[in-house]
Amino acid sequence: MVAIGLGRVPSAIGQQTRELHVWHTEVEPQTVKTIQDTSIAEFEKKFPGFKVRQQALGWGDLNTKLLASLAAGNPPDLTHLNPFMTASLYTKQLLRPMDELIRALGESDIHEATLKLQYFDGKYYGVTHAMGATYFAERRDLREKKGIKPPETYDDMLKLCAALTEGGRYAFQMPGEKLYMGFVHPAEWLAGNGGSWVDPKTWRPQLNSKAMLEALDYAQKLNKFQPQGWPGQKYLDTLAALANGKIAMAHLSGARTIGYIERYAPEGMRDPEHFMPLLRPHGPSGKVGISALDGENWAVFTQSKYPNEAFEFLRLFYKKEHYLAYCHTVPIHLSPIFKSMLNDPTYLANERIKKWRPWHDVMVTGLKNNRFLPIGFSRPEDNLLPFLAELDGSGIVADMVVEVMVGGKNPKAEADRAQKRAEELLTQLGVKRWS
């Protein structure tokens, strides 16, 4: 079992306290406090010689800090990882397998949407902390007043945007951070338009493929329905703009948006009759729209100082009462990874889940109908690509999107330029398989 060798609890007298470093991406104060009061408190009681130091980091900061700590040889003992980074770290032999933990948690109860995301050569190297769907968040009342159905295609979405842009209000706003508009959204466009980042066999980039060109054309047309200064604004700014009526849809949203609606929307409008999720439309070459599934995985490194204790901490993190409390800190956005818990009356009894139940139902139905792929994935097999983290970090895709959307440049010319740069990058990384 994972607990092998954990009998060596240091004697309290005269022995220095050891620190278990845990990094994660849940920055909301109530979540940080709950982790401290549940898993950490129980862990420190169980292992009196240890102090757990948790550090909450935003997505963008996490990737940068992690890569620096790995290069320096002192990563945290336990961390969240973006799923598109995992294959890259696995091929560099930086991750420890966690099969025993997965079996202890209940392999068959972990949702299929996340179970095998970090599964390489017959072993598990990660476990998702929680699942959160992403989508448009819309002012449902405004769309319904126009008598328009939820859009299914790019054309439907452009017509809806034209109808909702009026009287100083814009139809939507995209977040300006490069990770979102330059990686997360292009992955969704490819996935929902029959495309992929690379050719599945040769790994040759597909940035100037028909699927990407159609998506860039759509993005360029969409741009006129959002406020001009959007590239300088962030994800959270778009949620505030939706809640206070400046826009009719936030392009990137999850159930975390509910907190903004309850804080900033006018009283009498803080409900699912006015605000609802809207799944992504599909392109002319696609059959169904795909949205990103937000769910970082826990990882333990080969360089971790206290790997046994890190796994022991995870057992406590997923202990039912601790995990329920964790998921309830951002209801619906932190949906449990366990199928049994998704329908558990104790989980569903949370006040916010009861009030916003239609948002929970969108998530569950989307999971059932395969409408979600992990962040940055254009197809399920992308979890095996060992260069997605580098492609994101290079800014190649982000530059292309900015030139097309903000600069109004020709999509084909920008896609050709990005394609050339991506081919050079993959060649430099030594992963070129095409001739």
Question: What is the predicted function of each stretch?
Answer:
Residues 1-92, 100-107, 231, 285, ...:
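Conserved N-terminal structural module of periplasmic/extracytoplasmic solute-binding proteins
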Residues 77, 106-142, 171, 285-291, ...:
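A structural signal for short loop-to-beta-strand junctions that line the ligand-binding cleft
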Residues 77-80, 248-253, 259-260:
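Paired acidic/hydrophobic, glycine-rich loop segments that form the ligand-binding mouth/hinge
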Residues 120-121, 125-129, 134, 158-205, ...:
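Extracytoplasmic/periplasmic solute-binding protein
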Residues 161-164, 201-232, 276-280:
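Glycine-centered hinge/linker elements that transmit conformational signals in sensory
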Residues 255-271, 284-395, 433-434:
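C-terminal lobe and pocket-closing loops
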